[in-house]
Amino acid sequence: MLRDGIFQATLARHDLLTRASVPSPRVAGVTDDNLLFLTELPGRPLSKALFEPGNPCTAESLVGLLDQLPPQVCELPRRSPWSESVDHYCRMVAAAMPDQQDRLDRMARIISQGLSGLPQGNEPTHGDFHEGQIHVWNGQVCGILDVDTIGPGRRADDLACLVAHLSTVQHMNSSQADRMRQILAGWVPVFDTRVDPVELRLRSAAVAISLATGPYRSQEANWGAETLSIIDAAEALINQVA
């Protein structure tokens, strides 16, 4: 059940994407007390397909999905990119792991300096583009969830969100980790042809740092090691361009 203002805004977003033939859930019904019923997407979540045999999807189909977002998305309210809050997230992580303060300060400085002066962007964006939101089938993208975050921004923000999430997956065995590295090695060069490679990595690192707050907040049994691995991933992204 959604508050009235949020309900109307969410309904309008679904209607906008339906009219543009974006493969997102369709509105199956609404109630007077603001319940919204959506159709189920076909295919499988990318988060599962990543670890199944075969190619889950192509990088081109991921970019193509974002290209289907209609220009009217840019008329919606703007959401701040993760990189604007990198100092905040660095402080949160450092509060849990004080010995990482210097590394985090360095990363925040490089990200902020590297992205300073870039315009906000006026491209249609999803706003939270990661493997849990994307559905795939037969090696192609077939749907996208959680469209309430759509709005204007930079394409690099969406692609960076996906790269960051894939770079920080936890609880993988060695074969799964190898597969993830291979997927990233195949996808990122395609993303680099669409957005600036330096911007992509800096924004990816910023998203990764925001994800580094998760293990401590959820009190994972091995939260320290998990947090450190995410910090390492963020630093590796930065070191590719710094």
Regions found by a protein language model. Name each.
Residues 9-12, 32-33, 98-106, 215-242:
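Regulatory N- and C-terminal appendages and interdomain linkers associated
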Residues 156-192, 206-223:
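Active-site activation/catalytic loop segments of kinase-like enzymes and analogous catalytic loops
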Residues 36, 114-157:
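Active-site acidic catalytic loop and adjacent metal/ATP-binding pocket
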Residues 1-5, 50-57, 119-121, 147-153, ...:
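Short, contiguous acidic/charged loop-to-helix segments that flank catalytic cores in large enzymes
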Residues 74-126, 193:
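An alpha-helical support segment within catalytic cores of ATP-dependent transferases
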Residues 198-205:
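Rossmann-like AdoMet/SAM-dependent catalytic core
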Residues 1-80:
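ATP-binding pocket architecture of kinase catalytic cores
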Residues 25, 36, 60, 64, ...:
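Feature representing long, continuous alpha-helical segments
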